Amino acid sequence: MNRFIAPAYFTGKTGHVMPPGERAAFLRQLQKSQDLSRVILQKNRNDLDARYFLAASYGLRASFAITIDHNLREAFRNGNRAYASLKKLIEEKPDYYDAYLTVGVYEYIVGNIPWYLKWMAYVIGARGNRQDGLTHLKLASENGQYVRNEAQLVCMVLYVRERRFAEALEIARSLNGRFPRSFLFALNIAQILRMAGQKDQASAMFVQVEKKVENKEPNFDRLTLHSYRFDMAVELMSMGQLDAAEDRFRKVIDDPQSIREEKAQSHLRLGQLLEWKHRPEEAVREYQNVLSFEDFEGSHAKARDRLKKLR
């Protein structure tokens, strides 16, 4: 969730590289979808479903270009093609609600690109604004036949970006009710509650997920308990739930399954937490423990800096 709501999510580059095999498989299936749509359209050029899925495939290519390849020109080239086709479909049949998903996403993205890139969007013909995008996405989320769930998921993320937490929370709870085995929706509820300032409720939700991971409930067993506890402790610490956070950091440290980086970072965070709790001598011991591990993301420098200030 935190990645999706970041201001630069649609344009910022990451260090992640898609494995070549997965990339080839994705593009192969996308091409297969386009080929099947074209076969149907050769027989009946007015087949609405074939028109929709062909245009939607270009929308997926656009999403792939901007999120994986970070190729803005390629994203707008495919996005414009999808947008134009689906806008025409909507004009002919306004109640073809699935088409509003791609249209809405495109409009929202165009409306949110940084000002210094807007000239490029204008030159290559991209048009759209944030509010139109949200309006069209809501239509798809309420009335779509094929993409209602996907549209609701997109709306949830974008409502969080817009700080419309009550609406985002309503969707997250609805999706969690329909897909109770998805740990993602349960975590989304906790994260939205945290961002909305409802810290006690957020904490309780994180604990609920922890119990399901601990009990190895279906699908929740895909999360490793020690890694989840570390992330949970960081969340709890950020909310000021210091006792609960301390307990989880110590469990990560004591867990033989925890990787060394998690242990080192737990000692570092625990030192910071103990300083907040006015227990400097214990904090010093935690910072010293950090130095017994390898240096992970500057952990040694951070620990030495705090030790210098505490002595």
Locate each region found by the language model:
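Short coil/linker segments at helix-helix boundaries
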Residues: 1-46, 53-95, 102-146, 150-157, ...
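Amphipathic alpha-helical segments of tetratricopeptide repeats
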Residues: 84, 91, 135, 141-142, ...
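Residue-level recognition of tetratricopeptide repeat
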Residues: 47, 96, 147-148, 182, ...
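TPR/TPR-like (Sel1-like) alpha-helical repeat modules
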Residues: 83, 87, 125-129, 134-135, ...
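Register position in tetratricopeptide repeats
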Residues: 60, 109, 161, 195, ...
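"A position-specific structural signal for the A-helix of alpha-solenoid helical repeats
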Residues: 53, 60, 102, 154, ...
